[in-house]
Amino acid sequence: VRTGVPGSLVAWRVQPGDTVRAGQCVALVEAMKMEFEILAEQGGRVEALLAEVGHVLVDGQPLLALDPRHDDGQAHDGGQQALDPDHIRPDLAEVVQRHLVTQDAARPEAVAKRHAQGQLTARENIERFVDAGSFIEYGALALASQRTRLKEAELIARSPADGLVAGLATVNAAQFGEQAARCMVMAYDYTVFAGTQGVINHQKTDRLLHLALQRQIPLVLWAEGGGGRPNDEYPGVSLLDNMTFLGLARLSGLVPTVAIVNGRCFAGNAALAGCCDVIIATQSTTLGMAGPAMIEGGGLGRFTPEEVGPVSMQEPNGVIDIVVKDEAEAVAVAQRYMGYFQGRIADWVAPDQRLLRHLVPEKRTQVYDVRAVIRTLFDEASGLELRPRFASGMVTALARLEGRPVGVIANDPRHLGGAIDADGADKAARFMQLCDAFDIPLVSLCDTPGFMVGPEAEKTATVRHFSRMFLAAASLTVPYFVVVLRKGYGLGAQAMTAGSLLAPDFTVSWPTGEFGPMGFEGAVRLGFGKQLEAIADPLQRQQVFEGLVAEAYRRGKALNMAAHLELDDVIDPADTRRWLLRGLASMPQPAPRQGRKRPFVDAW
């Protein structure tokens, strides 16, 4: 019998005169701190031991001599009992126990407190969001960096996962398939040091964000928490060398990112939420770049957390995209939002398109709800509006056409008559970037008298903000279709049509469409001012003015525009959906992407 590995002879398992069988261990050899069993290749009687314990052996060196004439022909059974698949070894039991103490079941008081406030735990939110059984957790055994202050047993009990539950999962896989359903989830745990960002959970976050960047994995983040954790132990000075915020920002435009906010979300937690494509917040949310302690420390006054950035402030100012009742609804909306970026759905219902003929009033000065047009034009119950209370004159929504995701921008004539103000331009421009980044075609429903003018408008930096729509549209690569519902005047109409009536893949109008370089009343007063002033009789002057305006309206009718080929067609409103579907069918499919199309999606 020869050695099969170089090393030191540790022990003999047989002695001269013993009978051995093939496969029986005859000696132990140690190499590189590991023990190797030397097995007999055949049976027989041991005649001599050829090495002493402690000797260093070379590979293939003879160890003992066997007389094969005494081989009984039986293989060695190993002397092992049948394995019990349910037996838990002590080393595994320790690991199992460490994992168990991170679960909600091991923390009944913390869970009960959370539930008493009408809130879910971090693990409950993730469990409800992801597909059943799909979640694998990274860094579950992490502990807070407070080892000089707290004993390990205390850290295990008080800082499970260091306050950040994170890992990989799928969402909506049954609908879109596992590849499209890939998702990274990260949830700050408010029951652990108020969801603050500790040294170790920063490292965990950085690890996962780097993985999301490498493998292009969409991210959903529950951002509730108080920002940095000042009582953690850090061997450096500032902790400003962490990569967390850079890591999340690098995902912008590469993969969809969603922040869900509930309760208090301040400082670093809020900064991460602000880097995401969309913020979904519950009605109990307060969201700000600093909490009360930091505000007071800066000498800026004393406030309660709920006074800093409540939903009543952060929804109309555009910070929050979607407001929901509670965390359960937030999960459902996040699942739905992710679906628009995962693909088409097979089940859809088209509303009765004939209703579109009656949604824009015959009286041209009567306002209407453009959201009713959106609900009727696109698949039934498929719309999800973003930032509805911010810049309400500009509607931005995700919807579907025969199951295919599309983005919708639309003027709402109930607000400023559909005029585009600075906030509305920002809202539309950012939404264009979002849709283009992820290959979602855009549909523009135009009904605008132009952009907002006047000294008050200029105080909002309209010149710069309004121009964002031109810049964003000029960089689009996705299909862009325009339907003019009624008004299409001046630069506002050009902004809604990607810079020009001829820029979109098609520009069509409903019969109610009216067009001009500016509002006709103003154009007549500007162009015929001297002629009108020369008419002494006020009644005659008004009649001449009204006649000039009527002629301008006649020239600006949609039919006349189409006759001059400034429109692709004037269509029956009931035919709009067919136009959009045929337009989409005529466009090439976007090429598979290995990286991002756009440098990033603007935070604003």
Where is each model-derived feature located?
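Ligand-binding clefts of soluble mixed alpha/beta catalytic domains
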Residues: 74-604
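Short hydrophobic beta/alpha edge segments that flank linear recognition/processing sites
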Residues: 18-39, 57-72
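C-terminal, active-site-flanking charged/polar segments
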Residues: 45-48, 53-65, 503-507, 584-587
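Conserved, short, structured surface segments that act as functional micro-motifs
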Residues: 39-40, 49, 65-81, 224
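Methionine-biased hydrophobic packing positions in alpha-helices, especially
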Residues: 5, 32-34, 496
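Acidic, low-complexity mobile loops and tails
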Residues: 1-27
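Generic structural motif
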Residues: 2-9, 40-51, 57
